[in-house]
Amino acid sequence: EFLENAKKLSMYGVDLHHAKDLEGVDITLGVCSSGLLVYKDKLRINRFPWPKVLKISYKRSSFFIKIRPGEQEQYESTIGFKLPSYRAAK
């Protein structure tokens, strides 16, 4: 019964990583089975489902995701995050 309740929680199965957005604001990246989640002050501010993610890459301590364009957009967009270290970005 405990596990049944636990898996209903919004943070169940989310692997959290401290990061900063490209403006230097502290955020937390969450990786889970449904996609990549972005939290600020423990509040989810963005969600990127895996089918929308075209490419994941890293360079030094930066981590980038390329997002498939939506219905109204023509081009993919790349979103970057700064992580504490090269190993964290990798």
From Swiss-Prot:
Gene3D superfamilies attached here?
Pleckstrin-homology domain (PH domain)/Phosphotyrosine-binding domain (PTB)
Q: Which organism is it from?
A: Gallus gallus (Chicken)
Residue stretches making up the FERM domain: 1-90
Q: How is it modified after translation?
A: Phosphorylated at multiple sites by different protein kinases and each phosphorylation event selectively modulates the protein's functions.
Any one Gene Ontology BP term: cell division
Name assigned to this protein: Protein 4.1
One Pfam family matching this protein:
FERM_C
Any one GO CC term of this protein is: nucleus
Q: Which UniProt keywords apply?
A: Actin-binding, Calmodulin-binding, Cell cycle, Cell division, Cytoplasm, Cytoskeleton, Mitosis, Nucleus, Phosphoprotein, Transport
Q: Which GO terms describe its molecular function?
A: actin binding; calmodulin binding
Location in the cell? Nucleus; Cytoplasm, Cytoskeleton; Cytoplasm, Cell cortex
Q: What does this protein do?
A: Protein 4.1 is a major structural element of the erythrocyte membrane skeleton. It plays a key role in regulating membrane physical properties of mechanical stability and deformability by stabilizing spectrin-actin interaction. Recruits DLG1 to membranes. May be required for dynein-dynactin complex and NUMA1 recruitment at the mitotic cell cortex during anaphase.
Q: List the disulfide bonds.
A: none
Subunit field text: Binds with a high affinity to glycophorin and with lower affinity to band III protein. Associates with the nuclear mitotic apparatus. Binds calmodulin and DLG1.
Q: Does the keyword Nucleus apply?
A: yes
